[in-house]
Amino acid sequence: MTLALKLTNVGMRFAMNSGGEKGHFQALSELNLEVNRGDKLGLIGGNGAGKSTLLRIMAGIYPPGSGTVWRAPGLSIALLSLGLGFKNDLTGRENALLAAVLQGMTKAEAKSHLQAIGEFTELGRFYDEPVKSYSSGMRTRLGFATGLLLDTDILLLDEILAVGDQSFRNKAREALSQKLTKDRTVILVHHAENAIQEICSRVVWIEQGTIKADGDTAEVLEAYAKAP
């Protein structure tokens, strides 16, 4: 097994202001996790458990408040989540080009992917309109197509398969299944057990910012379902 990501004693807290009183919310606490290259890992837990925060730390969007995050040198990573990663004044096509260049492609290589990305999104003329004019569903289509078709080494999916119309959700899941090569690492947050079962061979259950269980998909999902 080749290690792709390693989180050691990772903690994260956010400032809160409730009723005029300042305080803190502990999103993650001393979390330790290793992800190997090629892992298909599902993250489950209730709302506010820390799943989305964890993905953002993995992606480098948030620096951890404590602990360390290591990523294997040379591996590209992308987080697909509603509203993240787009420059609103650029068009969909320009955002796709920028994403490809930021992942290390030359401009010529990046341009060679733009038609396929545009066709997958089914955005039509809106592909060449500013992203600030997009609905959340249109942003989702663009983000998913860009992350998937650029062959990112580590793909982080935050409920991205649960939005959009049913036709696009089916198309996205089928495309993702075809892209699940041996070396591609996928970390998926999803509330639907069938999506987790279909894609993931390992599941991590997070509760109140800590790992409650880590193991075989069926076993962890069963334990989670039986929890009070």
List each model region and its residues.
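ABC ATPase "signature
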Residues: 214-215
